[in-house]
């Protein structure tokens, strides 16, 4: 099972290009491909020379770039959607594009939680945002920093593009449906700006700044962070899954029962709770290959984004299929 995210027109670090993606699809064009929604009726048993193609998040270029290539080679695929961004962010798909892809018979749409937001795992930073940080990281972190804005700023700053990220702390994070985690307390951003803009702090090296802040956050954790309760966590998990599921099922008149964990961060509670929300299968990002008899509890994926070199991709595919 292959995993992709974006497909860019040109070569970009960390993101597969249109030409690179087409080479991947050309290589697998003679294999049997399936959509996730087809697996249950097959009892999760696939042909020996078969492959699953997946995309996470639901970016616009899945339609503008990848879809035409899938059609060219008649390859089936599944896109795991973050529905909060659909119709609300220019970098993501809209429902008309999603319907067109689904009605083509080639593309299925499944669950990736409603928002894909992270939570702070530990009151410790690992670095700072640079001026040229990409939109993907900023978009993910915006939900964290927005919690720390003042009431006035929350009314004014509604989008990650409105926030200056330069110099903000990069925390250790996890998916908000994986662990309880922590939120920033309201007003954190004002306090943070106050001491990082002081002459004493500015004169420190990046390493010294990190050490200073980690000591400060450890000593005054309750002043800056708020632990998420078990009740809040479970409510969040339920909302993220059920709202994601509701929107896809209502808009496409289909069942959505496969959950791709954001970042591959698995739920640390009793997974039966998530199953009761209508989830039958869980999709990972482990880098492993699946057996012909797929385990619906753990559908593994190989990260196609990271195999940009065609010779390496070919070698990987030969290893996987010769091994089986």
Q: Which role does the model predict for each range below?
A:
Residues 54-55, 110:
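Generic enzyme active-site microenvironment
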Residues 17-20, 91-96:
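Charged helix-capping and loop-helix junction motifs
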Residues 2-6, 109-116:
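Histidine-centered catalytic micro-motifs
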Residues 78-80, 110, 260, 282-283:
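Structural detector of well-ordered beta-strand residues that form the stable sheet scaffold
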Residues 59-60, 115:
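Short active-site segment of divalent metal-dependent hydrolases/proteases
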Residues 1-54, 60-62, 121-123, 135-324:
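C-terminal active-site subregion of NodB/CE4 polysaccharide deacetylases
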Residues 63-83:
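A short alpha/beta connector and helix-capping loop motif
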Residues 29-30, 67-74, 94-111, 275-276, ...:
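Acidic (Asp/Glu)-rich catalytic clusters
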